[in-house]
């Protein structure tokens, strides 16, 4: 029983359901919302890591490409998106890097917030999975993250500040089934 659970928690390859979502038609993926009961259950689920073998796969490359295309599409126009928001319960996020020249979107597999500094600051947040709502959330302005480099497959640590740090915290929360509304200081 324990072995089966360990395998279930640490998949070694993409499931058929994941492949179907990743390789679905079009470059824009459907964004799950809390308005749909089934979607809401997915959004409240914890995510599994992505293995090195999976990071080398065409499915991962397609997923990364489609996540960026989805979050930047005119229908969404977001600054970040996480695996569960497109139906993939894996630890992967795409984040717009406002701390880098040109504000590029970058994809981070197996990302985790591992440290924070300073005090939290309250700021407005919204979410692609909670359309039409915004609220004030207290977040750290300085964090450290770790993620798996797709070039070396080693854990990489990065220190991030400002609005980009807020985006990472929001997206990493999604990977643990947490929505920004769980922290709300005021919903409009």
Regions found by a protein language model. Give the residues of each.
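Bacterial N-terminal signal peptides
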Residues: 1-6
